[in-house]
């Protein structure tokens, strides 16, 4: 696993000059999506997708990538505090390997997403959102939080 600083440097060196970036917050039940504007200043929540099966998940994501003319995909990688890969992180990597040939030549990157969901949860609680509403939007907001952090670092 490369460091956050190294990932940002890799993105700076390899991303096309312009174009939308899609961030994916992969969960066991839901997938949160967020995308940047074409100039990469602002991240916006896109959708929360209820996972079904690998084939349907691949189809959904590839359609989103095509529809929004995405130039790069970044998966949040849920790794342990020790830096070791979690079981979910291994699932993310495995799924990305299936997505890669479908969306080629669009590159896929990974970014350490430790604490993103918790940070978003705290913000939603502070905003006094109900538990039900938080559950509906947490995944896409976590993806947005992740992506905005990346955009700010670029």
Feature annotation, model-predicted:
Residues 1-22, 29-154:
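Phosphate- and other anionic-substrate recognition elements at nucleic-acid/protein interfaces
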